């Protein structure tokens, strides 16, 4: 599979990149950085450092994209520490970012190989929305768009109604869901259901003592502490890397449904909420077209196995 990852590189974004670099059959063709978790230039350094740690320095270009959301001001995520890497203090990578803008890189790569490139969008959707506004043909030329964001009509992680990626740029999310892409959506609801590693799984990874399992141990430290305070046990959550694992191996999906996904852009309390509903609502409403497949349950065992393979 030929893949572009659009990322706000921090914590779990980096394990997703490791999966894409290390899983046989996957070619990570480019990384595009988007506004999100931590200050923009730090995210670029985190992406470059991750590529270097994985042994792919100079082989995967990194492009800089949108530095702020479309309408509302940027807000950092507090999940991953100030540097997004739990203070792991990785050396500055030798590779430097490209000069071409991420939006143009996405358009160029997709239009050069229509129907061949998948995009994994694991950040606010600003870059993808700007790309499809500039070149609407990419909606049909991207083979598949795998999105991590929103909830399945459930509780979010940044507000009770919203997940971070859609909350930060709901206008961009709305544009992307209305653009005609072939979308699979992996939500925060799925994250809490299928992506968690419990204490025994974490011990198994730490016991591997490989350079990449050590990278995982260090970079996941702050989110694990936050999760322990919030959920009462030392779990680790993997919204982005589960989405990547599903993209690389859709057999992980145990249950999914076709749905209409609409993003709330105006609600005072519900801004960034993803309404996930069937195409026909009743006679007060027009019929809506299905615009995404929403993953409900994925195999935690299969995901855990893929992560261990990537770290080995
Ligand atoms: C998403 O937001 C970010 O904090 C994570 O990187 C992930 O993409 C989870 O809400
Ligand atoms: Ca992310």
Which positions does each model-derived feature cover?
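Metal-dependent C-N hydrolase catalytic cores
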Residues: 3, 44-112, 289-300, 308
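Short, surface-exposed amphipathic charged segments that create phosphate/polyanion-binding patches used
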Residues: 75-82, 159-163, 202
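A residue-level signal for conserved active-site and pocket-lining positions in enzyme catalytic cores
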Residues: 62, 176, 244
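Active-site histidine-anchored catalytic micro-motif
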Residues: 1-49, 57, 89-193
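Short, mixed-charge, low-aromatic patches
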Residues: 1-7, 60-66, 85-87, 126-132, ...
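Conformational coupling and interaction surfaces
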Residues: 1, 16-22, 27-28, 164-167, ...
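Short, well-ordered secondary-structure micro-motifs
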Residues: 72-75, 157-158, 195-198
């Amino acid at each position: 599979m030929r893949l572009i990852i659009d990322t706000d590189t921090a914590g779990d974004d980096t394990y997703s990149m490791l999966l894409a670099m290390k899983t046989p059959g996957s070619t990570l063709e480019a990384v595009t950085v988007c506004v999100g978790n931590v200050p923009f230039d730090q995210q670029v350094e985190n992406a470059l450092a991750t590529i270097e740690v994985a042994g792919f320095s100079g082989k995967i270009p990194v492009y800089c994209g949108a530095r702020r959301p479309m309408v509302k001001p940027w807000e950092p995520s507090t999940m991953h520490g100030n540097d997004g890497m739990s203070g792991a203090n990785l050396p500055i990578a030798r590779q430097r970012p490209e000069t071409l803008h991420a939006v143009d890189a996405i358009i160029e790569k997709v239009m050069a190989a229509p129907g061949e490139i998948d995009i994994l969008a694991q950040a606010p959707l600003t870059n993808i929305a700007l790309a499809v506004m500039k070149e609407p043909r990419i909606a049909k030329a991207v083979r598949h768009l795998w999105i991590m964001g929103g909830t399945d009509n459930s509780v979010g992680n940044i507000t009770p109604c919203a997940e971070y990626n859609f909350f930060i740029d709901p206008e961009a999310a709305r544009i992307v869901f209305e653009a005609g892409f072939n979308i699979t959506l992996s939500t925060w609801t799925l994250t809490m259901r299928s992506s968690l590693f419990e204490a025994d799984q974490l011990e198994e990874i730490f016991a591997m003592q490989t350079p990449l399992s050590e990278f995982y141990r260090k970079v996941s430290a702050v989110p694990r502490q936050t999760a322990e305070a919030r959920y009462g046990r030392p779990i680790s959550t993997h919204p982005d890397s589960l989405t990547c694992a599903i993209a690389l191996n859709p057999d992980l999906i145990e249950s999914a449904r076709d749905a209409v996904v609409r993003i709330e852009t105006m609600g005072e309390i519900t801004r960034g909420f993803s309404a996930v509903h069937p195409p026909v609502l009743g006679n007060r409403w027009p019929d809506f077209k299905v615009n995404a497949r929403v993953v409900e349950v994925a195999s935690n065992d299969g995901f855990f196995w893929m992560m261990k393979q990537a770290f080995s």
